[in-house]
Design a protein with these regions (language model features):
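Conserved, structured C-terminal
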Residues: 1-186
Length: 186
């Protein structure tokens, strides 16, 4: 599967111009199979932008260039074009990156995703009893955002550094970036 993201305040208009207005009704993290000019895709309401957006999952990798051209043309009426992920916006918004902000030991309740869990599933679902127990007892860890005292911009990125207090490890720093808006490391 080859993903392409259409993000930002004009994404609804651009994606609707390609697929139709039904995309505006997609709830966040929902998806629908569709096609454009015979190219099979999955359209998902998701992405790395606090401004909202879509991810288009190409099911036939040989059609990547054609799909790119379709959306490049679709963006012209709104004067938009190719961009890149914005790490600062993602971190300021609290959007998670699997493997960057989480690992195989992270559970949904630690990262504010518990509300998306259906805990009323059968006992045959792998891990459901463990998740029910964590929900009942509460998670041992919580992910949260920090504003750091460091005056100079730190090197951004995925870091997984220990957070120490009085000689004891109290947490992990999983990501950091200089926020121009806050003029602080977050």
């Amino acid at each position: 599967v080859s993903p392409m993201a259409i993000q930002g305040p004009k994404s609804d208009d651009v994606v609707a111009s390609v697929f139709g207005d039904w995309v505006r009704e997609l709830k966040y993290f929902w998806f629908r199979e569709s096609s454009i000019e015979g190219i099979p895709v999955v359209v998902a309401r998701s992405g790395w932008s606090k401004q909202g957006g879509y991810e288009i999952y190409l099911l036939d990798g040989s059609q990547g260039t054609r799909l790119w051209e379709i959306f490049r043309e679709a963006g012209k009426p709104w004067d938009i074009g190719p961009g890149n992920p914005n790490l600062t916006e993602r971190i300021e918004s609290g959007l998670l990156s699997w493997g960057g902000d989480t690992d195989e030991k992270t559970n949904p309740f630690e990262v504010r995703m518990g509300k998306y869990m259906d805990l009323d599933l059968s006992d045959e679902v792998i891990g459901i009893e463990a998740l029910q127990k964590i929900h009942a007892e509460g998670p041992r860890r919580h992910q949260l955002g920090l504003i750091m005292e460091e005056e100079e911009p730190m090197r951004p990125g995925f870091v997984w550094n220990d957070i120490m207090f009085e000689g004891n490890k109290i947490g992990d720093l999983t990501n950091n970036v200089w926020s121009r808006r806050l003029e602080k490391n977050i």
